[in-house]
C-alpha cells in the first residue's frame, strides 16, 4: 500500500440517523475502490463495519468503524458512525479527528431529530458538512420534501450539486449541475453512462447550475469578480469556491445516491477527491496550551488516540490520527498522559475487520496499533522531546442510569473488571461503585446503550448480570435552629469514659453573619467565638463549625474529636441515611472529667448531640434536580409536555427550532428513571433530550413521608 502525504488524505465521518444507510454507503465506496472484492449488507450480517457479534445481533452499528478506500491516487479514510442516539459517543469520537462530515439522510424519513442532533455536534466541532440523500430507489422516496426540510433546518447554505430525475422504484438517473451531465445506471449500478441533459430537464438544470455558481462565487472575492466579469465560472473555479465554502461552513453541498444499488457512489467519491478538503487544507489540531499543530510531515511525530476496541484474540486495538510527523513501525512513543513509553510494534491501515500492515503513516492519516500497555482514548503519543498534548474528547452527560449486579455473587469482581474495560472502549459508558448508595451504578446514553453492553457481557464474557433500580443520592438538611446536649458516660471498673457536649445547629446560608446570640433555655446567650472551621463537603454543601467554649469547660484538644463525631453523623444523616449538608454548628458548653475524658468520649457525645439537634431542627430531604432539554417534533409536543408534568417537572420555557420544539424543564432525578425509553415510546423514537445536574431542592412533604416510610421499612428488615 502506498504511503500518503497530508494533501492526499481525506478524513471523513459518515454520520446520520439510524437506518440512513451509512454502512451500506461505506461498503459501496470500499468496493468501488477495490479494498473489498464484494459488497456486504447489513441484512446479511457481512459488512466490514458491523463485524462484532453485538452489532450483528442488533442489526445496528454500536462502535465507530475506521475504514479506508483508495481513489484517484488519494486515500479516503472513513469513520462509519452509529446512528442510534444511544451511541452518540462514537459520533463525537469520529468528529474529533475527521476533516469533513458526510451527513447521510434517508430520502423516505427526511431530516430527523437525529440529523438535527448530530449536526449540532458537527457545528460545535466546526467541521465542513456534505449532505448525501440516500435510498432514492425506495418507493416512498421524497427528494423534494427531504431537501425542503434540510433547507428549513440549515438555511441557504444547503446547495444542490445533484438531483434525481426518476426517484422511487426504477430510480437510475441523476442530473449533476456542477458537471452539467446526466448519469444513467444499469440495474447493477457501478459505473454510469454519461449522457447530455435532456431537454425536459434543461431549464431546471440551468437554474440550479447558476445557483451553484453564485454560491461558489460568494466564498471567494476573486471568484466573485470573475463571475461578474464573465457571467459564469469554470468547473475548476466552481470546485475552488465550493471547497472554500465547505471549509468555512458557508456551504453544505447536496448529493443523491442509492448506496444499496451502488448508484452515484463513484461520482460522490470523485467529488470527495476533487473538492473535500484534505488534511493539509485544514488548520491542524490545537494543543491544551493553545498551540496550533499543522498536519505536516516534517514535524515531530505526534498522534492522538480517538478510539479503542478490545478483541478476543488481539486485545486492545488503539485507533489514532497522526497529527504531526511520521509514525513508523517499531517507534517508541511517550504517552503524555501517563509518561510511559509505548512501542508501536505493529502498524495498520484499517478497513473495519480487515487490517493491512503498513510500515509508516504520515501526518493527517488514520491508523491503528495493538498491544499498547496503558493507552486510552484521548491520549497523546509523542516522540521523545515533543511536548504536544491534545485535549481529551468531551462526551455528553449520561441520560440513563441503572444499578447492576452479578447473578452469581462469585462473579462480582470479574463483572466489575469487565465493566471498567468496557468504559475504556466506550467512555460515554460510566461505571462507578457508589459508597454512598452501596450499589454499582452504570450510566449511559439510553436503555439500548446499556442493553447492548449487557448482551456483550453475557455472551462474550459468560457472566450473567441483572439490572435493578438505582437508589437516588438524596441529601438531608435542616430548616431552623435547634439546641441539644448529650453526656456520654461509661464506667467499667478501670478508667471510664466521660464527655458532655452542648451545641446549637442552624441552616447555613452563603454570606450569613457570624453568630452572636442564641436563645438557650429561653434566655439570650451571647457567643464568644474562639475558633472557626469551614468545610466544603465532598458530597456538596458546607459545614461551618464554631468553638464558642468559655472558661475551658472543654479543652481545645477535644474539639477535633467533637467535629469528627459530627462529620461521621453527616455521612449518614438521621432521616434516611443520606449525606447531610449546609449546617452551622456552635459548641458553646460542656463538661470534662479530669481522668475519664478522652477523644472517643467527646466524639460520641458530639455525634449524639448533633443527631438529637438535627431531628428537632425541621429536617428536610433534598433531591437532585436536573436541567432537561427535550427536542421533539411539533406534533408530539403536547404528549411530551403532558408526560413531563406527571414527572413533577417545572417547565422553564419552550423554543421553536426548525420544525421541532425545544422544551426546557427542571426535573427530579427520581422522575427521570427510564425517561429515554418513555420518550422514545411517546414519539416513535423521533425525540431526544439532554440532562445536566442543576442542584438540590427540598422534596414535597408527601414525597418526604414516602421516603421516610420506605427507609424505616428497610431499617426494620435489616
Tell where the protein language model's regions lie, with residue ranges:
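Structural and coupling elements of P-loop NTPases
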Residues: 1-718
Amino acid at each position: 500500500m502506498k504511503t500518503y502525504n497530508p494533501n492526499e488524505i481525506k478524513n471523513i465521518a459518515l454520520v446520520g440517523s439510524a437506518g440512513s444507510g451509512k454502512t451500506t454507503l461505506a461498503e459501496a465506496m470500499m468496493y468501488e475502490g477495490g479494498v473489498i472484492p464484494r459488497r456486504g449488507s447489513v441484512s446479511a450480517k457481512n459488512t466490514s463495519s458491523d463485524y462484532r457479534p453485538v452489532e450483528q445481533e442488533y442489526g445496528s452499528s454500536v462502535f465507530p468503524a475506521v475504514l479506508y478506500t483508495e481513489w484517484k491516487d488519494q486515500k479516503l479514510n472513513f469513520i462509519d458512525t452509529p446512528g442510534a442516539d444511544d451511541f452518540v459517543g462514537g459520533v463525537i469520537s469520529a468528529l474529533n479527528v475527521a476533516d469533513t462530515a458526510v451527513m447521510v439522510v434517508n430520502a423516505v424519513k427526511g431530516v430527523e431529530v437525529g440529523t438535527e442532533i448530530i449536526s449540532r455536534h458537527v457545528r460545535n466541532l466546526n467541521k465542513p458538512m456534505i449532505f448525501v440523500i440516500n435510498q432514492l430507489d425506495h418507493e416512498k422516496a421524497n427528494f423534494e420534501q427531504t431537501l425542503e426540510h434540510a433547507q428549513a433546518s440549515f438555511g441557504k447554505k444547503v446547495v444542490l450539486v445533484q438531483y434525481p430525475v426518476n426517484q422511487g422504484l426504477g430510480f437510475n438517473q441523476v442530473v449533476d449541475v456542477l458537471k452539467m451531465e446526466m448519469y444513467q445506471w444499469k440495474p447493477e449500478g457501478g459505473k454510469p453512462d454519461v449522457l447530455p441533459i435532456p431537454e425536459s430537464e434543461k431549464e431546471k438544470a440551468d437554474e440550479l447550475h447558476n445557483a451553484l455558481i453564485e454560491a461558489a462565487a460568494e466564498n471567494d472575492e476573486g471568484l466573485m469578480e470573475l463571475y461578474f466579469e464573465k457571467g459564469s465560472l469554470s468547473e475548476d473555479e466552481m470546485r475552488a469556491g465550493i471547497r472554500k465554502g465547505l471549509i468555512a461552513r458557508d456551504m453544505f453541498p447536496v448529493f443523491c445516491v442509492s448506496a444499496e444499488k451502488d448508484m452515484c457512489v463513484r461520482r460522490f467519491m470523485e467529488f470527495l477527491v476533487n473538492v473535500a478538503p484534505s488534511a493539509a487544507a485544514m488548520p491542524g489540531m490545537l494543543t491544551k496550551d493553545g498551540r496550533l499543530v499543522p498536519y505536516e510531515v516534517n514535524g515531530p511525530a505526534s498522534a492522538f488516540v480517538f478510539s479503542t476496541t478490545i478483541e478476543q484474540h488481539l486485545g486492545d486495538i488503539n485507533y489514532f490520527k497522526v497529527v504531526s510527523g511520521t509514525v513508523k513501525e517499531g517507534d517508541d512513543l511517550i504517552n503524555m498522559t501517563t509518561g510511559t513509553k509505548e512501542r508501536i510494534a505493529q502498524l495498520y491501515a484499517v478497513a473495519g475487520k480487515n487490517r493491512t500492515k503498513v510500515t509508516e503513516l504520515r501526518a493527517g492519516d488514520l491508523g491503528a496499533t495493538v498491544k499498547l500497555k496503558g493507552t486510552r482514548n484521548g491520549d497523546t503519543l509523542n516522540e521523545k522531546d515533543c511536548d504536544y498534548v491534545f485535549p481529551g474528547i468531551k462526551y455528553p452527560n449520561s441520560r440513563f442510569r441503572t444499578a447492576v449486579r452479578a447473578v452469581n455473587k462469585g462473579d462480582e469482581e470479574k463483572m466489575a473488571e469487565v465493566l471498567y474495560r468496557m468504559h475504556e472502549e466506550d467512555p460515554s459508558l460510566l461505571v462507578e461503585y457508589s459508597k454512598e448508595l452501596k450499589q454499582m451504578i452504570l450510566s449511559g446514553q439510553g436503555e439500548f446503550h446499556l442493553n447492548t453492553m449487557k448482551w456483550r457481557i453475557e455472551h462474550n464474557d459468560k457472566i450473567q448480570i441483572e439490572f435493578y433500580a438505582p437508589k437516588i443520592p438524596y441529601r438531608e438538611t435542616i430548616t431552623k435552629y435547634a439546641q441539644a446536649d448529650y453526656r456520654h458516660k461509661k464506667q467499667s471498673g478501670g478508667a471510664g469514659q466521660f464527655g458532655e457536649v452542648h451545641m446549637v445547629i442552624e441552616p447555613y446560608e452563603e454570606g450569613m453573619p457570624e453568630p452572636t446570640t442564641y436563645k438557650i433555655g429561653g434566655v439570650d446567650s451571647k457567643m464568644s467565638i474562639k475558633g472557626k472551621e469551614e468545610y466544603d463537603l465532598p458530597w456538596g454543601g458546607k459545614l461551618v463549625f464554631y468553638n464558642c467554649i468559655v472558661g475551658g469547660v472543654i479543652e481545645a484538644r477535644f474539639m477535633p474529636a467533637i467535629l469528627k463525631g459530627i462529620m461521621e453523623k453527616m455521612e449518614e444523616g438521621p432521616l434516611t441515611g443520606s449525606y447531610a449538608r449546609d449546617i452551622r454548628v456552635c459548641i458553646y458548653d460542656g463538661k470534662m472529667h479530669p481522668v475519664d475524658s478522652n477523644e472517643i468520649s467527646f466524639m460520641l457525645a458530639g455525634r449524639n448531640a448533633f443527631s438529637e439537634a438535627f431531628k428537632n431542627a425541621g429536617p428536610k430531604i433534598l433531591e437532585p434536580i436536573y436541567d432537561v432539554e427535550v427536542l421533539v417534533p411539533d406534533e408530539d409536543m403536547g404528549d411530551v409536555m403532558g408526560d413531563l408534568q406527571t414527572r413533577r417537572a417545572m417547565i422553564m420555557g419552550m423554543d421553536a427550532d426548525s420544525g421541532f420544539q425545544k422544551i426546557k424543564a427542571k426535573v427530579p432525578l427520581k422522575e427521570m428513571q427510564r425517561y429515554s425509553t418513555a420518550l422514545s415510546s411517546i414519539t416513535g423514537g423521533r425525540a431526544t433530550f439532554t440532562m445536566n445536574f442543576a442542584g438540590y431542592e427540598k422534596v414535597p412533604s408527601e414525597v418526604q413521608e414516602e421516603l421516610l416510610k420506605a427507609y424505616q421499612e428497610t431499617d426494620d428488615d435489616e
